[in-house]
Amino acid sequence: MSYISGARSLPDEQVRIASTKMDGIGPKKAIQLRYRLGISGNIKIHELTKYQIDQIEQMIAQDHVVHWELKRGERADIERLISISRYRGIRHQDGSPLRGQRTHTNARTARKQIRKGNERRLPKEQATD
């Protein structure tokens, strides 16, 4: 098993398929990346040289926003929504559905998780009283 830009890939996978497992790279970007580097369509991960793997990582780092950068951006967007008290920010805080889904009979999993979270907090609050 090898890692390319933080994503695990099996040695028998094609480069195109393995690169789509990286957050931020879809099928079209994977094909573009392969063409820009001059890598064949059917080449597998274990057939790549160290130099080719380094080239792939450099190209991804230069041109694409991937994994930790995406996660950081998403978290910053959510924090911004919460800080300006937008409806979506409040729903994020509550753990409720954001996009108008029904909550009376649905979203049971989210409600269970909220309930479990409150149960964990109760004994701590009672201990401080």
From Swiss-Prot:
It is found in: Mitochondrion. InterPro entries: Rbsml_uS13_C, Ribosomal_uS13, Ribosomal_uS13-like_H2TH, Ribosomal_uS13_CS. GO terms for molecular function: rRNA binding; structural constituent of ribosome. GO terms for cellular component: mitochondrion; ribonucleoprotein complex; ribosome. Residues 92-129 are annotated as: Disordered. Residues 116-129 have a biased composition (Basic and acidic residues). Gene3D superfamilies: 1.10.8.50, 30s ribosomal protein s13, domain 2. PROSITE patterns: RIBOSOMAL_S13_1 (PS00646), RIBOSOMAL_S13_2 (PS50159). One of its GO terms (biological process) is translation. Keywords: Mitochondrion, Ribonucleoprotein, Ribosomal protein, RNA-binding, rRNA-binding. Its main location: mitochondrion. Pfam families: Ribosomal_S13 (PF00416). Part of the small ribosomal subunit. PANTHER family: 30S RIBOSOMAL PROTEIN S13/40S RIBOSOMAL PROTEIN S18 (PTHR10871), SMALL RIBOSOMAL SUBUNIT PROTEIN US13M (PTHR10871:SF8). Belongs to the universal ribosomal protein uS13 family. Located at the top of the head of the small subunit, it contacts several helices of the 18S rRNA. This is Small ribosomal subunit protein uS13m. It comes from Zea mays (Maize).
